[in-house]
Structure formats: structure tokens, C-alpha cells
A protein has these predicted regions:
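NTP-dependent nucleotidyl-transfer catalytic core
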Residues: 1-184
């Protein structure tokens, strides 16, 4: 597939590409860029998820390697369920993703987020993020900002660390994720 067709496929039904010139350069330089989307497995995969799922399918068709992060630790920090509930949803998500025919590498957050390198990266990000910037990012994540916890403030920093340490070239998300991804 030529570069123009790849770019057209990647841009299809996309609200925003934050750095389109960088995307064009990436497609010139890298035959198989790594694309990623992260999901909190806090309930069943639903119709709303299909927006990003279909974009991941477009990226696969455009020759990208796709990773899906099942962010179990994020779900715990964001108070979206008890550990056993989230573990069950992880199993359900894996089955559903497979049934949808996506050939993505599925990565479980807890498989790498407790490692020293990851924790050090989150701490470095915390050192360079102001409280105000962190609160703005957190407002996109926490439903009840007046009763938000410190763990929810940690969440956006983890999203940035996920992207960096998973070797991601293209991050797929909703428009609410753009505020978090500005840290990259």
C-alpha cells in the first residue's frame, strides 16, 4: 500500500491528528509504526468503544502494529471497581477483542506498571508537571472532581508513561485524551 493510501486510511473518520506533519514523516521512515489505544476494563466493551476499535482496525489495515492496553491498574486507581471485578472484565475484554478479529497485541497494565523503570518514569513526569496542569488533565478523567483522590491525579502521568514505555508511535484516543497526551 502506498504512503498516500496509508495516510488516507489513518485519517478516515478521525476528528484530530495532533501532529500531522510528524505522522507523515513517521509513515515515510517506519514501515510498521506501533499504534496503541488504552482502555479501562471496568465494564463490558460497548458501542462507544467501537469508534476507537474501528480506528485500530484501520491502522492494522494501513500496516501498523497495534497494541491494546487493558489498563487494570488505571481502573483501580480511578475507583472503577474492585480488583476481582476488574480481573473478570479483563477476561471478558480479551474474548471480545478476539471475537472482533483485531490482531492486536493485548497488554495488561499490571504486567509492567509495577516495574522500577515504569515507576521511575512516572516520578520523573510528576516532577515536571505542575499541580494546575495535573488537575486540568485529571478533570478529563475523574467524574467527581470535588471528591477526587490523589490516585486519580497519578492516572494522567501513567497514561504518558504507558505511551513512552510501550514504544508507541501513534496514540489513539478520544478528544478528552488530547489534554493528557500534551505531556508527551
Amino acid at each position: 500500500m502506498d504512503k498516500e493510501k496509508r495516510l488516507e486510511l489513518i485519517k478516515r473518520n478521525t476528528a484530530e491528528i495532533v501532529t500531522e506533519p510528524e505522522l507523515i514523516e513517521l509513515l515515510k521512515e517506519k514501515k510498521k509504526p506501533v499504534a496503541y489505544c488504552g482502555y479501562e476494563p471496568n465494564g463490558p466493551l460497548h458501542l462507544g468503544h467501537l469508534v476507537t476499535i474501528t480506528k485500530l482496525q484501520d491502522l492494522e489495515e494501513a500496516g501498523c502494529s497495534v497494541k491494546i492496553l487493558l489498563a487494570d491498574i488505571h481502573a483501580l486507581l480511578n475507583r472503577k471497581g474492585e480488583e476481582h471485578e476488574i480481573e473478570q472484565e479483563v477476561k471478558n475484554w480479551k474474548k471480545t477483542i478476539k471475537a472482533l478479529g483485531i490482531k492486536a497485541e493485548i497488554v495488561l497494565g499490571s504486567s509492567f506498571q509495577f516495574k522500577k523503570e515504569y515507576q521511575f518514569e512516572v516520578m520523573k513526569l510528576a516532577q515536571h508537571t505542575t499541580i494546575n496542569r495535573g488537575l486540568r488533565s485529571m478533570q478529563e478523567i475523574a467524574r467527581d472532581i470535588d471528591n477526587a483522590t490523589i490516585s486519580q491525579l497519578w492516572y494522567p502521568l501513567m497514561q504518558v508513561a504507558d505511551i513512552k514505555l510501550m514504544g508507541v508511535d501513534i496514540a489513539v484516543g478520544g478528544t478528552d485524551d488530547a489534554a493528557v497526551d500534551e505531556h508527551r
